[in-house]
Structures are given as structure tokens and as C-alpha cells.
Amino acid sequence: MRILIPILVLIAAIDLYINYGRVNSSVAEAEQSAALVQIEIPSELSGLATIGKRGFDKNCAACHGENAVGKDGVAPPLVHKIYEPSHHGDESFQRAVAMGVRAHHWKFGNMPAIEGLTRAEVKAITAYVRELQRHNGIN
């Protein structure tokens, strides 16, 4: 029993080291990737979209890029015709956050569910993305 505890501690330490490194390298790669589209930023946002921008920056930008322009090799731009409201309605954003998304338009891989966001927070984030889209001719 005395030898079992140090072995378990060693295994846990190795696991932590391996997984911590993976998470940090994924975040670092996401931060360094180039934008996939160039967009114009609206000079003003509605109140809901302003709240949504804060939520997007905190929860989405690491993968989808600042102002939803995507990141090469990481995640697609959300300011893109594929995500226009007639093809991906607002509820699709809710479902993506709640359940994740199987890759179907892009070759970035699957998107995991995002924990900790309420429907109201996702609604605000969606409002932000929609205002960016409209400002860039995506209706």
C-alpha cells in the first residue's frame, strides 16, 4: 500500500503535465492563427450586441477570431455567407453552444459544446454576430 500511493501520485502528475500542455498549446495555436476574412466593423453596436461582443470575446474569439473573422486552421469565420440567417438561423447558434456541432461546411473538425452560457448570453452573442454580418452585406 505504501508504494501504491506514490505511484498514483506520479501517474496523476504525468497526466496533468500532458493534458496541461495540450490545452495551453491549443490556446497558443488559436491565438497565433491568421484571420480568414477581412471585415468592416460597425462604428456603433446596439445595446444587446455590445453585451454580446463581451460574451463573444470571452467565450468564442479564441477559436472564431476577434470580431468573428475565423482563424486559419482553427475555426471558421462567422461573418460569412454560410452563416446568413436564412441558412443558419439564430437557434442554430443556441444549439451549437448547447450541443456542439459536427463539422459539415468546413474542415476544421467538430465544435465542442460550450459550457456555462445561458440562452440569454447566446442570444446577445448572436445579436453581435448578426450586426457584424449585416454591416458586411450578409443578410
Regions found by a protein language model. Name each.
Residues 2-18:
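Hydrophobic membrane-insertion alpha-helices, especially the h-region
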Residues 3, 33-39, 76-79:
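Short glycine/proline- and charge-enriched loop/turn segments
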Residues 16-28:
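Hydrophobic single-pass membrane-insertion segments
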Residues 26-55:
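Electrostatic cytochrome c docking/interface patches
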Residues 48, 89, 93, 121-122:
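Stable alpha-helical elements in mature extracytoplasmic
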Residues 52, 56-66, 111, 125-129:
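The canonical Cys-X-X-Cys-His
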Residues 53, 65-96, 113-116:
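Gly/Gly-Pro-rich "capping" loops immediately C-terminal to redox-active cysteine motifs
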Residues 72-79, 99-132, 137-139:
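Axial heme c-ligation environment in periplasmic c-type cytochrome domains
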